[in-house]
Amino acid sequence: MGLSILMVGNSLTAANAMPTILASLLDAQVVAITRGGARLAEFSNPLTKTGSRVLQALDGDGAQAEHGCFDYVIAQDMSHLPATNPSAHERAVAKICELARDHNATPVLYGTWGYREGSAKLKKLGMSAAQMGQLMHEGSLRAAAAHGAIFVDMAKAVAQMEDASWFYAADGVHPSPAGSQFVAQTIADALNR
């Protein structure tokens, strides 16, 4: 195995075993620490269960091969936070980037997409899919640039699709199996540059 990757995120990361797909594409070891609905901020907070797990994985103890010595930490935030609270998103990105670098890993921000037009969650936010996608792109791009993370811009990638219906699961938020494959390939391409 070549690369060793720690992925942190929520169900947008875990859906359809996307970390396993990424591992296969890169012939890498991928350790995923996820919790449905999680915000990125909790992954760098040692007082949370997920934060404690991340620190344990990064610190490693030598007894488990899957812990410690990661080349990359790939981080994904709550599905709408870069659009709805970009300052909170940027603070979380700053902390996870610092944590990754403190453990000699390169930080990668996996920026997610706007919700599908017509989805219930998008209606709740009171914006169009195009507006959300643009805000997701801007919020994540700004955070990644400010803190020196490699940026995987899924908001832009999905927004540029002529027909993105195949990308989404039925809820209009999560990726379909083909969508998760596309996300994994996009991340792999970014790491291979």
For every predicted segment, state its role.
Residues 31-33, 108, 150-152:
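General small-molecule cofactor/ligand-binding pocket signal
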Residues 7, 17, 21, 69, ...:
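Extracytoplasmic/secreted proteins, especially bacterial periplasmic and envelope-associated proteins
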Residues 120-193:
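Catalytic His-Asp segment of secreted/periplasmic serine-dependent ester chemistry enzymes
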Residues 77, 109-112:
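A cross-domain feature marking catalytic cores of carbohydrate-active enzymes
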Residues 34-40, 114-117, 157-159:
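Acidic helix-start/capping segments at beta-turn-to-alpha-helix junctions
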Residues 3-8, 12-94, 101:
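Conserved SGNH/GDSL esterase-like catalytic core that processes O-acyl groups on lipids
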Residues 98-108, 149:
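A short helix->loop->beta-strand "cap" motif at the edges of active sites that frequently abuts
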Residues 72, 78-85, 115-134:
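Serine-dependent acyl-ester chemistry module
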